[in-house]
From Swiss-Prot:
Keywords: Cell outer membrane, Membrane, Receptor, Signal, TonB box, Transmembrane, Transmembrane beta strand, Transport. It is found in: Cell outer membrane. Belongs to the TonB-dependent receptor family. Gene3D superfamilies: TonB-dependent receptor, beta-barrel domain (2.40.170.20), TonB-dependent receptor, plug domain (2.170.130.10). Pfam families: Plug (PF07715), TonB_dep_Rec_b-barrel (PF00593). The gene is hpuB. CDD domains: ligand_gated_channel. It comes from the Bacteria. It is a multi-pass membrane protein. Residues 1-22 form the signal peptide. This is Hemoglobin-haptoglobin utilization protein B. One of its GO terms (molecular function) is siderophore uptake transmembrane transporter activity.
């Protein structure tokens, strides 16, 4: 058995020692949003699912998505460069293959297709990441591991992250008509300061909630032990356009790809959540929601390939970026409850959402004396907008029989999306920016498109036998997604010929399933089983991205199929007075992965698949032609264990507890030729150990964490889809590491809470695998020297850092 399994077996053995059989736990309360409302008699543990409630978010000092999953080894955050993160990685897939929803509303898709990254992503001119959300707005986060389109819809191949926003009812009631919360703090890793206000009130049948948060900070620090090293130009490494010979560019120092420090950055985020509701009576309620969030990041991109300096006079440009992520949402909902009727509860909802991902770029000359008053500044603006309008109708009904309970959840919904893009650039006079020295060039790189979708689902939970001994759930969902490229009247006949099925809809439809079984075979032990499926409809850039160029001709492909996943899981869970544990094994199969595929050389024959017309109508001959196509499949399997032990059960002081969370996963991708290759998105084995104490008075507590992560072996990586037989070149920098963290809290009276944490206490230098696999071998951003790897320490994680928060509630 491979060595990485040994810690898993060790914690499994610990599970046998968990005395989880001392007393019956208290009855579980009713489930909430997106859960079937049932009343159980034992603690429910679900395979591949974790709920993180507001109390835990505060305890863990969660300020971003990295903090959210810090102590969950089964999920990681995809690094997206200077503009922030780009979604999550779960069970060997990432980015758009992991669904992200806020109150059931899907968040923006990224521009992360292999084709887009080959053409544009390597140069940093687009903010192509998925948008993030303000953690202070949420009352609960549900993380699902494994295919889950039954609940989360398109994109839930590897899993889903579902956020639920706060409501006034979280804070106010008939006995407490108002609430005011004030929170502030600092985050050491990026010099962040933040403040947040939560206010809620209730008067007669009216209630309201306001959450306003402001954050500002700088670049995320690293743990570099090197200065900005000097490296000699060995040929034309740094400036492919240079005609002056190697002697002109001798040594690159504090700027360029060899830079060891993060690029200077300042950023600010402002977020507003407002809810207003009115209860007509106990059965009928109407509500309104408004969200507005904007993050601006200003970066001096000193590590850009083109900013390399020399020992002679300064040349090249300073490159400045402003990346903007903006999200606005408004919606209305109606709730109804019936004692007798086709539903116990009904929720009707309509939401509109706008997400903008923008990038401004300025190239400013380093030496103004070269051209004096005639110095020019290059400016470009890339704008991606995604608009969504969605309606849903959700119903819940529970039927009680003498020895069984049948709880059903059913509903339907639909929506439409609209994608708009802007892309233009120009030169202006440095000393008088009103004077343009070039035309404003606007070109079409991303074809704008419209989309529609609709779905219907039916999910059931059956509680059978006395004392809720058996629980069976089964559900089915139907989805239909369609998209069409917008027909622009400015398109020439030749351009229209480049876009197949222009204006017509291309649809993807199918069913998703989910079933599970929970057998309580002893008073405190459960046998769990689960089967689920997932799908992901092709994104707009995978379908419609077009690049008609003689050196790299990319054809649009509206005939792509949806990616599919099937997930099997088996587990053993136990709970009792002394603690709880869950051990599970899983296997997931993926198929029809969308990949960039080389089709061959171009032809001037319109009947051949490699026909490659240019915008002027000229057909290319003997140019390389590429297209996104459904190609490979993959499988992953692994083990997960998590458990909590209340150590007062063995005589230690009341409130002492220990915990462990372990994840091990392996897998392979299967190419069209039958070859099995490693999967770069698989995270190495990791385990989190925890020892803590919470005073019985609830006044104070302290927690210590140790995180052990294995190295990502080069043999477990692949260079690229074009080079399947060699490892990722930067995998050799992945080493095993252990981190130690410490957090504590102190309640001062009933109103004030102080929280503090120290991370990476030993100041360990280490690289996360997500950081190493984000390095690019070509382009101008996220680079190191390909030959010497100079600049690799720019990708080290933060060293020792401290977080602090103070919160007052009234």
């Amino acid at each position: 058995m491979p060595i990485p399994f040994k810690p898993v077996l060790a914690v499994a053995a610990i599970a046998q020692a968990f005395p989880a059989f001392a007393a019956d736990p208290a009855p579980q309360s009713a489930q909430t949003l997106n859960e079937i409302t049932v009343t159980g008699t034992h603690k429910t543990q679900k395979l591949g699912e974790e709920k993180i409630r507001r109390k835990t978010l505060d305890k863990l000092l969660v300020n971003d998505e990295h903090d959210l999953v810090r102590y969950d080894p089964g999920i990681s955050v995809v690094e997206g460069g200077r503009a922030g993160s780009n979604g999550f990685t779960i069970r060997g897939v990432d980015k758009d293959r992991v669904a992200i929803n806020v109150d059931g509303l899907a968040q923006a898709e990224s521009r992360s297709s292999e084709a887009f990254q080959e053409l544009f992503g390597a140069y940093g001119n687009f903010n192509a990441n998925r948008n993030t959300s303000e953690p202070e707005n949420f009352s609960e986060v549900t993380i699902t591991k494994g295919a889950d389109s039954l609940k989360s819809g398109s994109g839930a191949l590897g899993g889903a992250v579902n956020y639920q926003t706060k409501s006034a009812s979280d804070y106010v009631s008939e006995d407490k008509p108002y609430h005011l919360g004030i929170k502030g703090g600092s985050v050491g890793k990026n010099s962040q300061k933040f403040s947040s206000i939560t206010a809620a009130g209730r008067l007669f049948g009216l209630d309201a909630l306001l959450v306003y948060t402001r954050r500002f900070g700088k670049e995320t620090k690293n743990r570099s032990t090197e200065g900005n090293v000097e490296i000699k130009n060995d040929g034309y490494v740094y400036n492919p356009t240079d005609t002056g010979g190697p002697s002109k560019y001798l040594t690159y120092v504090a700027t360029g790809v060899a830079r060891s420090q993060p690029d200077p950055q300042e950023w600010v985020n402002k977020s507003t959540l407002f809810k207003l509701g009115y209860n007509f009576n106990d059965q009928n309620r109407i509500g309104w929601i408004f969200e507005d969030s904007r993050t601006d990041r200003f970066t001096n991109e000193l590590s850009n390939l083109w900013t390399g300096t020399t020992t002679s006079a300064a040349t090249g440009d300073y490159r400045h970026r402003q990346d903007v992520s903006y999200r606005r949402r408004s919606g209305v909902e109606y709730k109804n409850e019936l004692e007798h009727g086709p539903w116990d509860s009904l929720k009707l909802r309509y939401d509109k959402q706008r997400i903008d991902m923008n990038t401004w770029t300025w190239d400013i000359p380093k030496n103004y004396d070269l051209r004096g008053i005639n110095s020019e500044v290059y400016h470009s603006f890339r704008h991606i907008r995604q608009n969504t309008a969605q309606w849903t109708a959700d119903f819940e009904k529970q039927l009680d029989f003498s020895k069984a309970v049948w709880a059903a959840q059913y509903g339907l919904g639909g929506g439409r999306g609209d994608n708009a893009n802007s892309d233009y650039s120009y030169f202006v006079k440095l000393y008088d920016p009103k004077i343009l020295t070039s035309n404003q060039a606007k070109i079409t790189m991303l074809i704008e498109n419209r989309s529609k979708y609709k779905f219907a689902y039916w999910n059931n939970v059956f509680h059978l036998g006395g004392n809720d001994r058996f629980r069976l759930n089964a559900g089915i969902r139907y989805d239909k997604n369609s998209s069409s490229a917008k027909d622009d009247p400015k398109y020439t006949t030749a351009i229209r010929g480049q876009i197949p099925h222009l204006g017509s809809e291309r649809a993807h439809a199918g069913f998703s399933y989910g079933t599970g079984f929970d057998w309580r075979f002893t008073k405190h032990l459960h046998l769990l089983a689960k089967y689920s499926t997932g799908f992901r409809a092709p994104t707009s850039d995978e379908t419609w991205l077009l690049f008609p160029h003689p050196d790299f001709y990319l054809k649009a492909n509206p005939n792509l199929k949806a990616e599919k996943a099937k997930n099997w899981e088996l587990g053993l869970a136990g709970s009792g007075k002394a603690g709880n544990f869950k051990l599970s094994g899983f296997k997931t199969k993926y198929r029809d992965f969308i990949e960039l595929t080389y089709m061959g050389v171009s032809s001037d024959n319109p009947n051949k698949p490699t026909y490659a017309p240019l915008s002027d109508g000229t057909a290319l001959v003997s140019s390389p032609v590429w297209q996104n196509q459904n190609r490979s499949s993959a499988w992953v399997k692994g083990l997960e264990f998590n458990g909590t032990w209340n150590l007062d059960s063995i005589g230690l002081p009341q409130g002492t507890h220990a915990g462990v969370n372990v994840s091990y996963i392996k897998g392979k991708a299967k190419q069209t030729n039958g070859q099995e290759t490693p999967i770069n998105a698989l995270s190495p084995w990791s385990a989190v150990y925890n020892l803590g104490y919470d005073a019985p008075s609830k006044r104070w507590g302290i927690n210590a964490y140790a995180t052990r992560t294995a190295a990502k072996k080069p043999s477990d990586t692949v260079h690229s889809n074009d080079d399947l037989n060699n490892p990722w070149p930067y995998a050799k920098h992945s080493k095993a590491y252990t981190l130690f963290d410490l957090s504590a809290y102190l309640n001062i009276g009933k109103q004030v809470t102080l929280r503090a944490a120290a991370y990476n206490i030993t100041n360990k230098q280490y690289y996360t695998w997500e950081s190493l696999r984000s390095i690019r071998e070509f382009g101008t951003v996220n680079r190191v020297d390909n030959k010497t790897h100079a600049g690799i320490q720019r990708f080290t994680s933060p060293g020792r850092s401290y977080n602090f928060t103070i919160e007052a509630k009234f």
